[in-house]
């Protein structure tokens, strides 16, 4: 049953990082593309 808790925590971490990047400047690890 612990696997479910780990999946939930992992999802929350990914979501937090995703929103943090989304509301910040675009990622810089790739060359800037026209958009």
UniProtKB/Swiss-Prot annotation:
Q: Where are the transmembrane segments?
A: 3-23
The Gene Ontology biological process terms listed for this entry are: photosynthesis
**Membrane protein topology class:** Single-pass membrane protein
| An annotated GO cellular component | plasma membrane-derived thylakoid membrane
User: Which UniProt keyword terms apply here?
Assistant: Membrane, Photosynthesis, Photosystem II, Thylakoid, Transmembrane, Transmembrane helix
Q: Out of the domains of life, which is the source? A: Bacteria
Q: What SUPFAM superfamilies does the record tag this protein with?
A: Photosystem II reaction center protein T, PsbT
Which Pfam family would be a valid example here?
PsbT
Note the InterPro entries from the entry.
PSII_PsbT, PSII_PsbT_sf
Keyword Transmembrane helix found: yes
Q: Where in the cell is it found?
A: Cellular thylakoid membrane
Q: Which family does it belong to?
A: Belongs to the PsbT family.
According to its UniProt entry, what is the function of this protein? Answer: Found at the monomer-monomer interface of the photosystem II (PS II) dimer, plays a role in assembly and dimerization of PSII. PSII is a light-driven water plastoquinone oxidoreductase, using light energy to abstract electrons from H(2)O, generating a proton gradient subsequently used for ATP formation.
Q: How does it assemble?
A: PSII is composed of 1 copy each of membrane proteins PsbA, PsbB, PsbC, PsbD, PsbE, PsbF, PsbH, PsbI, PsbJ, PsbK, PsbL, PsbM, PsbT, PsbX, PsbY, PsbZ, Psb30/Ycf12, peripheral proteins PsbO, CyanoQ (PsbQ), PsbU, PsbV and a large number of cofactors. It forms dimeric complexes.
Q: What is this protein called?
A: Photosystem II reaction center protein T
């Amino acid at each position: 049953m612990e696997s479910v808790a780990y999946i939930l925590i992992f999802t929350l971490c990914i979501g937090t990082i995703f929103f943090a990047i989304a509301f910040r400047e675009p990622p810089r690890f790739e060359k800037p593309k026209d958009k």
